[in-house]
């Protein structure tokens, strides 16, 4: 008779781990503190809520995260099932209707006979039994303190941010145009063209804009892949032109020319009634977001459905704590998964949950845990978070560099 497994946290990693356990016949007690206790970033009590972008990045197999997605599809990933079923147009990327995505994951797990959902906060690490802790970078203070004591190391952190979302019917379609970069795939993005003067005025006001106060925030304490747009602008007058405002491959059909800069909008829901401003993660005050982002051509009268915001993400010094199966070195049967382990990104978090779920299931069935091969996307990611120097351990997206190191 297989043992029961406790999963703490129903984010991307915890949801994926629960699915991998349940499909192997294991009974799971799944604990999620939302909606009874909220976090600074979540807005619902749904499982696998996407708190930042609605994009899961590239779908191309030549890209590390595209390869990771495909491995997960072959391993019957719930998160990939949900993403594929709820995707919205995004060119060569995989973007989803965030509400439909979370609902699919929630309904699937709540519908399983061998999953019992508990809407309550866990404040201590269970002393016995097989457990997966996947409470994410916004782990409650009480449990975060217990995890820090268990790991015996100081927790690490970085700051993450979300981009604003605007209502589609408030976008000036006489100015913006629909196109994907280099015309790859379908025309999936709305593009707001800027001339040099507009770009320079926008940059100047963006740098001057007032930011919200966030305890402990430092400009050098952000994840490079999710940098606030105002921090990027302050790095140099043309920095944004090589980032989210890059105009190459986005010729304006109205003029036949490539604009000086382009702000892209990506569909955020299946009804195409909302669009997020791509790459515009921010911690400007809400009034300043309205003032400055309304300078973008086509968004002069934009109605903001959600303003951007920033939050602190905490993670462990995993190389000192975990094995490549995401199991604690000093306590067999205790696993960790998700961004709290040092992986960064939606797909990476879910991937770590998949590996932890598979190994917790093996433990419950009396089998030995396994380390995925280092020359796979899943295995190379686990190898990174468990063998890198703990003193120099930044959070990391899937990377072909780590994949190739395993070959």
Curated annotation (Swiss-Prot):
GO terms for biological process: tRNA methylation; tRNA wobble uridine modification. FAD binds at residues 9-14. It catalyses: uridine(54) in tRNA + (6R)-5,10-methylene-5,6,7,8-tetrahydrofolate + NADH + H(+) = 5-methyluridine(54) in tRNA + (6S)-5,6,7,8-tetrahydrofolate + NAD(+); uridine(54) in tRNA + (6R)-5,10-methylene-5,6,7,8-tetrahydrofolate + NADPH + H(+) = 5-methyluridine(54) in tRNA + (6S)-5,6,7,8-tetrahydrofolate + NADP(+). It is an enzyme of class 2 (transferase). Pfam families: GIDA (PF01134). GO terms for cellular component: cytosol. Its main location: cytoplasm. It is found in: Cytoplasm. GO terms for molecular function: flavin adenine dinucleotide binding; tRNA (uracil(54)-C5)-methyltransferase activity, 5,10-methylenetetrahydrofolate-dependent. Catalyzes the folate-dependent formation of 5-methyl-uridine at position 54 (M-5-U54) in all tRNAs. This is Methylenetetrahydrofolate--tRNA-(uracil-5-)-methyltransferase TrmFO. The lineage of its organism: Bacteria, Bacillati, Bacillota, Bacilli, Lactobacillales.
């Amino acid at each position: 008779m297989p043992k029961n497994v406790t999963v703490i946290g129903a984010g991307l990693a915890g949801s994926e781990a629960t699915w991998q356990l349940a499909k192997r016949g294991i009974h799971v007690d799944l604990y999620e503190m939302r909606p009874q206790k909220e976090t600074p970033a979540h807005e619902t009590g749904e499982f696998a809520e996407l708190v930042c972008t609605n994009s899961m990045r590239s779908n191309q197999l030549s890209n590390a995260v595209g390869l990771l997605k495909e491995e997960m599809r072959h391993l019957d990933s719930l998160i990939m099932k949900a993403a594929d079923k709820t995707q919205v147009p995004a060119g060569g990327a995989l973007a989803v209707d965030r509400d439909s995505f979370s609902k699919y994951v929630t309904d699937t797990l709540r519908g399983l006979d061998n999953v019992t959902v508990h809407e309550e906060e866990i404040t201590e690490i269970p002393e016995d039994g097989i457990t997966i802790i996947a409470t994410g970078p916004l782990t409650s203070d009480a449990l975060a303190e217990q995890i820090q004591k268990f790991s015996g190391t100081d927790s690490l952190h970085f700051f993450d941010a979300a981009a604003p979302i605007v209502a589609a019917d408030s976008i000036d379609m006489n100015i913006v145009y629909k196109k994907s970069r280099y015309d790859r795939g379908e025309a999936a993005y709305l593009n707001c063209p800027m001339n040099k003067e507009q770009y320079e005025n926008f940059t100047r006001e963006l740098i001057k804009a007032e930011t919200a106060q966030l305890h402990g925030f430092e400009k050098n304490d952000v994840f490079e892949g999710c940098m606030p747009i105002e921090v990027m602008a302050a790095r140099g007058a043309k920095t944004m032109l090589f980032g989210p405002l890059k105009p190459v491959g986005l010729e304006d059909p109205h003029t036949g020319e490539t604009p000086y800069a382009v702000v892209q909008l990506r569909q955020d829901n299946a009804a195409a009634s909302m669009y997020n401003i791509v790459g515009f993660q921010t911690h400007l005050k809400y009034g300043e977001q309205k003032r400055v982002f309304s300078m973008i051509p086509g968004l002069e009268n934009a109605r903001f459905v959600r303003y951007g915001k920033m939050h602190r993400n905490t993670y462990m010094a995993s190389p000192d704590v975990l094995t490549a199966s995401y199991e604690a070195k000093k306590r067999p049967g205790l696993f960790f998964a998700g961004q709290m382990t040092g992986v960064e990104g939606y797909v990476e978090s879910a991937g770590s949950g998949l590996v932890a779920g598979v190994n917790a299931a093996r433990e419950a069935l009396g089998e030995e845990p396994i380390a995925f091969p280092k020359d796979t996307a899943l295995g190379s990611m686990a190898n990174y978070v468990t063998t890198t120097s703990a003193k120099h351990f930044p959070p990391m997206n899937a990377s072909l560099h780590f994949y190739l190191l395993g070959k």
